[in-house]
Curated annotation (Swiss-Prot):
Its main location: secreted. Secreted lipase involved in Dandruff and seborrheic dermatitis (D/SD) probably via lipase-mediated breakdown of sebaceous lipids and release of irritating free fatty acids. Has triacylglycerol lipase activity and is able to hydrolyze triolein. Mostly converts monoolein to di- and triolein, while free fatty acids are only produced in low amounts. Glycans are attached at residues 98, 230. This is Secreted triacylglycerol lipase LIP4. The keyword Disulfide bond applies. It is found in: Secreted; Secreted, Cell wall. Keywords: Cell wall, Disulfide bond, Glycoprotein, Hydrolase, Lipid degradation, Lipid metabolism, Secreted, Signal, Virulence. Disulfide bonds join 115-284, 360-406. Residues 1-19 form the signal peptide. Gene3D superfamilies: 1.10.260.130, alpha/beta hydrolase (3.40.50.1820). The gene is LIP4. GO terms for cellular component: extracellular region.
C-alpha cells in the first residue's frame, strides 16, 4: 500500500478541519485546571504523579489504542532548585506489553502550548505537512504492542531547544509512566526512546543526562535522527533559508529558559526583533516557518549588533552548554543509534559527527548511520530513518545486545520497504512512504514549495 502525496494532503486537510471543531472543545494547557498542580507539589520527588486522567486521542493512532492517559508530574527545569510540573500523554495499545516502554519524542519546534502533544494529539491539530508521518512513526511502536509515553518536554516556559530542560522532563516522564498503577509497568521495565529533528534534541539530551539524573532507569537504547546537536551551527546554517523560522523559535525557547540570555537579547534586539520573538509563543512550527521564510536574523531590522549576539559570552556560553558532547559527564550510558543525512540542510551533519566522535572518546556505545544519497534531506530522512530506528529499538527491547563500542556505516536508501514488517504494518509504512511520493528531492524541494504556496 503506497499513499501518494494527494492522499497525504487529504489526511492533513482532514486533520485541519477536525481541529477547527476540536479546538473549541479543548482548553489550552495554560487554561486547563488539570495542569495546575495541587498544594505541596514542590515537596514531592521528581517523577511523582500529581494527577491523572483518561483522554481521547484524535490523530490517526486512535484505532490502535485501547486507552490513553495523561499524567501531571513533578519535574525540574535546568537544575534541581527549579521545580516545575508538566504532563506526559501515555498511549496504550490493545496488545500492550508490560515489560517494555517507548519514549516517543514528538517534535514541537515551538514555544506555544497549543503545539504540545498533550493538546495537539487530543485536538487533532498537528499542523505541519509531515503530521501524518509523525503519527505513523508512533503507530509503528503501538502496533508492536509497546506502551508509548510522550512528554510535554518544554514545561510551562516553552523551552524549545533547551536540552537540559527537555532531557530532565523526559526522564521524569518515564519515571511517572513506570509508576502509574494502571499500566502494570515496573522499575525493571525495559525503556527505549526514539525521536527525530526537534525530537532528536529531546532524545539526545535524555540520553546525555540519564547517567547523572536518572541512573535507576532501565534504559536499553536510544534512537535519534536529524539531530540538531549544536544550536549555534544550526542557526548559522539555516539563517536566511526557507527554514529560518527555526532560528527565532530556538532563540525564543532558550531565552525563555535562561533569564540572563533574555535580558541580553532585550537590550540588543530591535523592537521588530522582540516582536518576532513573541511569534513562536503563539504559533506552531508550520506557522513559524511560513512567517519567516528566508528571514535574515542577523540583519539590522532584527538585531542592533548584527550576528554578534550569537557570539556574546552570555549567549555563547549557554549555547555551548546546549551542545551535545561538550561535557564528558553527559555521555550516554545506553546504546545509541544516530541517523543523519550528509546533506541535511537544517541540522548540520558535521555537528552530529563531532558529537559522535566526542561521545565515542568517552566510551559511549554509538552507531552512526550516514545517509549518503544525494536526494537525502532533513524531511526525507524522517521517513528513511523511521524503519531502521524502529527495528533497532525493537531489538533492544527484545533483549538483543547492540554492537559494542562505536561504529559507522553509510546508507543510500531514500525510502522504505513497505513489506518489511509484514501485512500488519504495511498500511503504516505506506503512510510513511507516501510522504516521500516521487517529489522529495535535494534540499527538501517539496516542503519548500509547500511553504511558499501557503505563505
Amino acid at each position: 500500500m503506497k499513499l501518494n502525496l494527494f492522499i497525504l494532503g487529504l489526511l492533513t486537510l482532514a486533520a485541519h478541519a477536525y481541529a477547527l471543531v476540536a479546538r473549541d472543545k479543548l482548553l489550552l494547557p495554560h487554561e486547563d485546571p488539570f495542569f495546575q498542580p495541587p498544594d505541596g507539589w514542590q515537596d514531592k520527588e521528581v517523577g511523582t504523579i500529581l494527577r491523572s486522567r483518561k483522554v481521547t486521542i484524535k490523530t490517526l493512532v486512535k484505532d490502535n489504542l485501547k486507552e490513553a492517559w495523561q499524567l501531571l508530574y513533578r519535574t525540574t527545569y535546568t537544575s534541581d532548585d527549579e521545580p516545575t510540573t508538566t504532563v506526559t500523554t501515555v498511549m496504550v495499545p490493545h496488545n500492550a506489553q508490560n515489560d517494555s516502554l517507548v519514549l516517543f519524542a514528538d517534535f514541537e519546534d515551538s514555544s506555544a502550548d497549543r503545539c504540545a502533544p498533550s493538546y495537539s494529539w487530543r485536538a487533532g491539530s498537528l499542523d505541519d505537512p509531515s503530521a501524518s508521518t509523525r503519527v505513523a512513526i508512533a503507530m509503528l511502536y503501538l502496533q508492536e504492542g509497546y506502551i508509548v509515553t510522550m512528554p510535554d518536554k518544554e514545561g510551562n516556559r516553552g523551552a524549545f531547544g533547551s536540552g537540559h530542560v527537555e532531557g530532565r522532563q523526559s526522564l521524569d516522564g518515564i519515571r511517572a509512566t513506570l509508576a502509574f498503577d494502571k499500566l502494570g509497568l515496573s522499575k525493571d521495565t525495559r525503556v527505549a526512546g526514539h525521536g527525530y529533528s526537534g525530537g532528536g534534541i529531546q532524545i539526545g539530551w535524555a540520553a546525555s543526562l540519564k547517567k547523572t539524573y536518572a541512573p535507576e532507569l532501565n534504559v536499553v537504547g536510544w534512537s535519534a535522527g536529524g539531530v540538531p546537536s549544536n544550536l549555534t551551527a544550526l542557526i548559522e546554517k539555516i539563517n536566511g533559508s526557507p527554514f529560518a523560522g527555526f532560528v527565532v523559535a530556538g532563540l525564543t525557547g532558550v531565552s525563555s529558559t535562561y533569564p540572563e540570555v533574555k535580558e541580553y537579547m532585550e537590550k540588543v534586539f530591535t523592537k521588530q526583533g522582540l516582536e518576532d520573538m513573541e511569534f513562536p509563543k503563539k504559533f506552531c512550527s508550520t506557522g513559524i516557518v511560513l512567517r519567516f521564510l528566508f528571514k535574515d536574523f542577523f540583519a539590522k531590522d532584527f538585531s542592533k549588533v548584527g550576528d554578534r549576539y550569537l557570539y556574546e559570552p552570555v549567549v555563547r556560553n549557554i549555547l555551548e552548554k546546549l551542545t551535545m558532547g561538550t561535557n564528558p559527564d553527559y555521555t550516554p550510558d545506553a546504546p545509541m543509534l544516530l541517523m543523519q543525512a550528509k546533506n541535511d540542510e537544517v541540522a548540520p551533519y558535521e555537528a552530529v559527527k563531532k558529537t559522535y566522535d566526542s561521545w565515542c572518546q568517552e566510551g559511549a556505545q554509538v552507531h552512526l548511520v550516514t545517509l549518503n544519497n544525494p536526494l537525502s534531506s532533513h524531511a526525507s530522512t524522517t521517513v528513511t530513518s523511521s524503519l531502521p530506528g524502529f527495528l533497532w529499538v525493537r531489538d533492544r527491547l527484545q533483549g538483543k545486545l547492540a554492537e559494542s563500542g562505536c561504529h559507522e556505516n553509510k546508507n543510500f536508501d531514500v525510502g522504505i520497504n513497505t513489506n518489511a514488517l509484514g501485512e500488519d504494518f504495511k498500511g503504516i509504512l505506506g503512510i510513511l512512504q507516501g510522504f516521500l511520493g516521487d517529489k522529495i528531492g535535494p534540499n527538501d524541494e517539496y516542503l519548500i514549495d509547500w511553504f511558499k504556496k501557503h505563505k
